[in-house]
Each structure stands twice: as C-alpha cells, then as structure tokens.
C-alpha cells in the first residue's frame, strides 16, 4: 500500500508557537506552523483548517475539532484524549506516539493516514471513511470500528481486544500480527479476513462453534 507522507517545510521555515513563547492567534486557518508544547484542553477549534503543520508534545485533551481540516500534518507525542473530531478531514496526516483514548472520529475522513505507537483505546471511528490508512503498534482495545467504509486498511502488531468490528468489511485485511481477543463481530464481517490458525480457532469460539 502506497502512503503519501505529509508534505511539510523544514522546521526552520515554520512559524513557531509554544506554551511559554509566542501564542497562536485566534484564526480560522493555519499554514506552515509548528505548535510546540501547547496546553489547550477544552479549546473550541471546530472548522479550523491546518495545512503543513506540526503539533509536538501538545495537550489537546477534550478539544473540539469538529469539522476541522488537517492536510499535511504531523501529530508527534500529543495527547488527544476525548478530543471531538467528528466529521473532520485528515489528508496525509501522521499520528506518532500519540494518545487518542476515547477520541471521537465519527464519520471522519482519513486519507493517507498513519497511526504508529498510539494508545487509542475506546476511540470511536463509527462510519468513518478510511482510504489508505495504516495502524502500527497501536492499542485499539474496545475501539469502535463499526460500519467503516475502508479502502486499503492495514493493521500491524495492534491490540484490538474487545474492539467492535460490526459491519466493518475486513476482506483481504491481514490481522495475523494483531491481538483479537474478545472482539465483537458477526460472521459476515469476518469473510475474507486473513488470520493465523490460532486466531481462527479463537474466532470460531466467539461465534459459538466447538472446535475439536
């Protein structure tokens, strides 16, 4: 799967904002910015547009990013727990070692997005549209991945314990490196999913089959 990375200027050419230095203005659009160590919980940033930006070690818990747009953006070691990103758009975005516990991404659009080393337990991606999205080394325990509309989705070494996959088309998706203990799923949802022999036996038990 080809993933286009975020296209961002060198940091020396970005406009820097920080918690202890220059604070970002109250604007609707931000382009070519580095947000370093900002602490802005519960901030109202709905419908804002961010292009060519880096968020580094920012505390963005409970922030309202409803209908916000992110193009060519990197989130690096940020805390987005309980952030509301419903119907937001993410295009060429990387989440690196971030926390997205209980983040709301209902009906969001994710295109060319990577999540690497993220803690995203209870994240809600219900009815999200995913196009070339890769989850690597992520904790997705009890995540809601219901009714996903996905094209080219990959999971590598992720923990999906008790995650909900109802009405999520998993055909052709390789889950052999992932933990699938107690996932919530229907038989049609499993059709075409690639699993290991051990995983196949565990999934059979979830569906009420007796394996001898």
Name each region found by the language model:
Residues 2-212:
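Tandem repeat scaffolds
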């Amino acid at each position: 799967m080809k993933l286009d990375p975020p296209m961002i200027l060198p940091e020396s050419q970005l406009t820097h904002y920080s918690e202890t230095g220059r604070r970002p203005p109250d604007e609707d659009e931000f382009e070519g910015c580095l947000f370093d160590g900002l602490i802005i919980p519960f901030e109202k940033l709905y419908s804002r547009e961010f292009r060519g930006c880096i968020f580094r070690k920012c505390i963005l818990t409970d922030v309202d990013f409803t209908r916000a747009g992110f193009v060519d953006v990197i989130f690096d070691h940020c805390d987005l727990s309980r952030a509301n990103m419903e119907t937001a758009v993410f295009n060429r975005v990387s989440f690196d070692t971030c926390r997205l516990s209980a983040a709301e991404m209902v009906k969001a659009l994710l295109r060319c997005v990577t999540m690497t080393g993220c803690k995203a337990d209870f994240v809600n991606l219900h009815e999200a549209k995913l196009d070339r999205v890769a989850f690597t080394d992520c904790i997705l325990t009890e995540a809601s991945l219901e009714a996903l509309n996905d094209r080219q989705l990959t999971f590598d070494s992720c923990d999906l314990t008790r995650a909900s996959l109802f009405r999520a088309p998993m055909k052709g998706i390789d889950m052999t490196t992932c933990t699938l203990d107690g996932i919530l799923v229907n038989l049609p949802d499993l059709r075409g999913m690639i699993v290991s022999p051990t995983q196949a036996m565990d999934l059979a038990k979830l569906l009420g089959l007796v394996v001898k």
